Amino acid sequence: MAKTYKIAVIPGDGIGKEVTPWAQKALEKAAEGVADFEYENFDLGAERYLRDGAILPEDEEGRIKANDAILLGAVGDPRIKAGILERGLLLKLRFDLDQYVNLRPSKLYKGVTSPLANPGDIDFVVVREGTEGLYCGAGGAVRRNTPQEVATEVSINTAYGVERVVRYAFKLAMKRKKHVTLVHKKNVLVNAGDMWQRIVDKVGEEYPEVTHDYQHIDAATIFLVSDPSRFDVILTDNLFGDILTDEAGSVVGGVGYSASGCINASDEFPSMFEPIHGSAPDIAGQNKANPTAAILSAAMLLEHLGFDDAAKKIHTAVEADIEELGSTVRSTDQVGKDILARM
């Protein structure tokens, strides 16, 4: 009998509510016979916040933690000041669930036009540290709104936090082309950069099959547009990863075909998977949104649970659909049906 996995579903806002059901359908079809899924839906996002002021109530977060994984649609609404939902929902889940790896695959599919003149074979993944660095909230300000105001943001890097994400990157590289590129700015950020490099060198000794090199962040941004095929696994910190993942999404044709995962690799808490596109309120409710990225997030969820063959069914179906019909204008439902029909 197939094991049943509990999945927390947060459709969120805008087109998130339209594309998430297709991720669920892809999960079920790809894993048919090997895994079953039990869903718990959570009404979290802009509408909930505007209705009763709640972002992530404690009891609901507790129920989310009891699941095996999380499927997220999209969060954001122009009626709400930027940052409120992102900090109160997405970042809170990331930190409370210790999702210390932000995983962002970037692949240029046949049938998708890259903005690069000669993109080559683009297929790499960014492994971004997700709970430390400049985004952990250390810092402050004094003498606000005066000429003497002082503001600080402190980048926190711990050996423990760095080593666990480095190990994740090398383990992932073993399943791919066996190459890791550390991206940092160690010539200027000498303390954090030196620690990152030493830990990469140490862990690298345990993976003799995996080669590794280093690039400064400025050089890496250049190579992402001049020679992206050189990369396999890009390993970097929170801030640099935030920059690189956006650029990576652009070189493969935009956010419509990109998914991401916020991973707790210890499985102490559930990991979260989502398309990287936003809530797109301008087309919400019109059956226009492309569900491909959401469906790819379902493949990432399956890979995380250990169902690589099931995930491959989704990847194969998506690649075939994009190659044949990627330039065809289709509705949300039609794209979803076309992809599922190939599985």
Curated annotation (Swiss-Prot):
A GO CC annotation given for this chain: cytoplasm
EC number of the protein: 1.1.1.85
Enzymatic class: oxidoreductase
Single GO biological process annotation from the record: L-leucine biosynthetic process
Domain of life: Bacteria
Annotated compartments: Cytoplasm
Name of the protein in its database record: 3-isopropylmalate dehydrogenase
The gene coding this protein: leuB
